[in-house]
Amino acid sequence: MKAVVLVGGEGTRLRPLTYSTPKPLLPIVNQAFLERQLTWLAHHGVDEVVLSLGYLPDAFESHFPDGRFGDLTLRYAVEDHPLGTAGAIRFATRGIDERVVVCNGDVLTTLDLDALVAFHDDRGAEASIHLTQVEDPSAFGVVPTRDDGEVVAFVEKPPKGVAPTNWINAGTYVLEPSVLDRIPERLTVSIERETFPRMLEEPSRLYAMTSDAYWIDIGTPEKYLDAHRDVLQAVLGGPPAPGARELSPGVWVQGDLHIDADARIEAPALLGDGAVVGAGARIVGSVLGAGSVVSDGARLLRSVVHAGGRLDVDAEAIDSVVGEGATVGAGAIASDHTIMGAGAELAAGARASGARIRRAQPDQAQQDEKRPDEGHED
């Protein structure tokens, strides 16, 4: 079975992390998010994946230099201009004349993909959509269905309290070639807002399957941190990261590292290879990337430090992300979903709450912050 993963968006809501690393390659508990998706697809019988690329495509080819991940064969479809979700699917499936699975490149889920395919077959569907239930659907597209799962409407971002259902499009599809044929080539088209709604106006067989499987969109700082917490708490099953071993209940480590005898580490947590934890440091519900440092007296609470990141003496990171090679200076505090990009620095004694901190560079950074996403979904 073949699959397409949509990984071309710019990930604007996770800037400045995504200035240097595409969102699907950001780590979730010390493993690239996309690797977790590919592992899930392979587990359900997918043997070939087309990565639909737009933003920073070279990063993906560098990450998978031999075009393989385990037993999966990877192919790359690089757009020269944004084509939207449906346009990207059409472009990525050139030369494919069989059923494909499609998933968004920012969704972590335990969906039983085999069950979705069986649902699709049982109903003789042209397209089947995975639906997940949320408490407040006002930020999503909701999909009311008949009892057998036949889709009756698409309602985009309904006002609070008036949504016809709380079941939303969860971003995983099974599509037959007839659906791909409905998408015009080389045009910017949204499958959620154009292709699927248009199918309801024509003779078609469009269905949706509800599931209570774990599901999260990692596209905001809050959800990115939530995904780390959930993986640490074994929502995916098994160890939280490749090669991890349990040092004490809920505290995992990788490789060789140094933890001072006076340091305090509270589960759930994972410390990467080469990490250093100093005297009097405290780590609670957090992840340390490879080669990262939490210095003497520093506190890391419900936060993530990417590879080579550093908290200097008595620094604090609370509900925040310290990017690759970034530094929280001595006595400084990063809190309330502060995001520090690769190589960024928070000066000694400084305070940052809900901030976006990028490595110092020319004024282009401020211009980039104001530029909206184009084409691919974020």
Model-predicted segments: where are they?
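Conserved N-terminal catalytic core of the sugar/cofactor nucleotidyltransferase
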Residues: 1-5, 13, 19, 26-115, ...
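Catalytic-core segments of class I nucleotidyltransferases/pyrophosphorylases
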Residues: 100-101, 108, 114-121, 134-137, ...
